[in-house]
């Protein structure tokens, strides 16, 4: 049996080629660095629009009161809070993240807001989830898939833990569709964003990586195809704000 390209060889870390086995550690260092300023990072990367994107992502999800939901790369918990509003008191949200620092920030933030009941926190790798088959009615990942080394494995795991009839949703920075806007977006990403990261978070390198990681992420049609290969049916995507981000959806049938 041939060895997986993600257990040997190289992969990308931003625009750099690195040993595949090292990417998880390098990404972990980035998010440990930005954990306390994560919402600021998203504000800088999206000019504040990420809050509207996230709310739309959750309000259009297939979820109902009483459902059990998994939010991967759950970060500081903003998606988890919105999901909990949808599933209500009888439902549950599991916030999963591979990075202990991000998970700690999310737990502290929700606890400080008095949001305790119905939330669970699990440090986990999206490529090998510690949950039984068919555990969740909805699985989401927001602004996290591009940082995963083996995206195909993560999509297969999302499919595995999803109940039959359930939906998986991916919210991610994607490929801008308007040609006239691409140079403006590139200028903001590569010239402005690292400077803002240095100014506000004292960390230009992490913000440079985050901008580069967007350009290395599969474009919309490619990711749709990857979801189909992972087993999902009725896969589709919707561009938001001219393709700066896209929402991908698929179902387990």
Swiss-Prot record:
Keywords: Menaquinone biosynthesis, Methyltransferase, S-adenosyl-L-methionine, Transferase, Ubiquinone biosynthesis. InterPro entries: SAM-dependent_MTases_sf, UbiE/COQ5_MeTrFase, UbiE/COQ5_MeTrFase_CS. GO terms for biological process: aerobic respiration; menaquinone biosynthetic process; methylation. It catalyses: a 2-demethylmenaquinol + S-adenosyl-L-methionine = a menaquinol + S-adenosyl-L-homocysteine + H(+); a 2-methoxy-6-(all-trans-polyprenyl)benzene-1,4-diol + S-adenosyl-L-methionine = a 5-methoxy-2-methyl-3-(all-trans-polyprenyl)benzene-1,4-diol + S-adenosyl-L-homocysteine + H(+). S-adenosyl-L-methionine binds at residues 76, 97, 125-126, 142. Pathway: Quinol/quinone metabolism; menaquinone biosynthesis; menaquinol from 1,4-dihydroxy-2-naphthoate: step 2/2; Cofactor biosynthesis; ubiquinone biosynthesis. GO terms for molecular function: 2-methoxy-6-polyprenyl-1,4-benzoquinol methyltransferase activity; demethylmenaquinone methyltransferase activity. Gene3D superfamilies: Vaccinia Virus protein VP39 (3.40.50.150). Its EC number is 2.1.1.163, 2.1.1.201. SUPFAM superfamilies: S-adenosyl-L-methionine-dependent methyltransferases. HAMAP family: MenG_UbiE_methyltr. Belongs to the class I-like SAM-binding methyltransferase superfamily. MenG/UbiE family. This is Ubiquinone/menaquinone biosynthesis C-methyltransferase UbiE. It comes from Xanthomonas oryzae pv. oryzae (strain MAFF 311018).
